[in-house]
Amino acid sequence: ILMFAHNGSLNRGCEAIVRSSSKIIKDTIPNSYVELASWRPETDKIIKDVDNFIDASPREIKPSFIEKARMFLELKLNKSEEYAQTQIHKATVDKIDDVDVCLSIGGDNYCYGEEQWLYTIDKNVKKKGKKLVLWACSIGEEDMTAKKLEDLKTFDLILARESLTHDMLKSKGLNNVKLVADPAFTMVKE
C-alpha cells in the first residue's frame, strides 16, 4: 500500500492521518507493507507502522530540447502539464508499479484550487491499473470545479471524513463515496 500526497509530519494533522492510517492498515491486514511518499520524509521517521519512506519531494527537472518541445506542445495543444508533472513527481509515479493500492492521504488537498500535480499522479495510478482511494477527505462545495470532479470520478473509492463532503460529492453524482470517521480519532494517547 502506498500512501501519497503527504507534505510531511511537521503538520500535526497530516502526521495524525499517517500515524492512525498506517496502524489501522497494519492491524487489519496481516503482513501488509505500507509505504509513505512524503515531501519531507525526515519528519515522518517517528511513525512506526510505516515500512518504507520515499522522498517524494517535487524534483527540479532539466528537460532536454525534445522534452521541452513535448511539454510546450502538450501545454499549447492539450492545455495539459501532465508530462512535466509526471517528471516532477517521478519518485511517487515510479513507486506505483510496486504496490497494489494507492491511498491519496492529503485529505484537504482538494480545497486548494486546481492541483494539476495531484490529478497527474491519480492518472498515473489508473494508467498502471492500480486501485486508487481518496482517504479521509474533506472538500467544500466552494472548492468543486469540473476538472476536480473529473478527477474524483477516477477513484475506486472516496472516503469522506464528514457528512458535508459525503453529501456534496453524492449530489455531484459520485457513487464511489462512503462516509467514515476521521482515522485520527483512533489514535491512542501517548
Where are these regions (language model features)?
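A nucleotide-sugar donor-handling region in carbohydrate enzymes
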Residues: 144-190
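Aromatic- and Gly/Pro-rich donor/ligand-binding loops
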Residues: 1-141, 184, 190
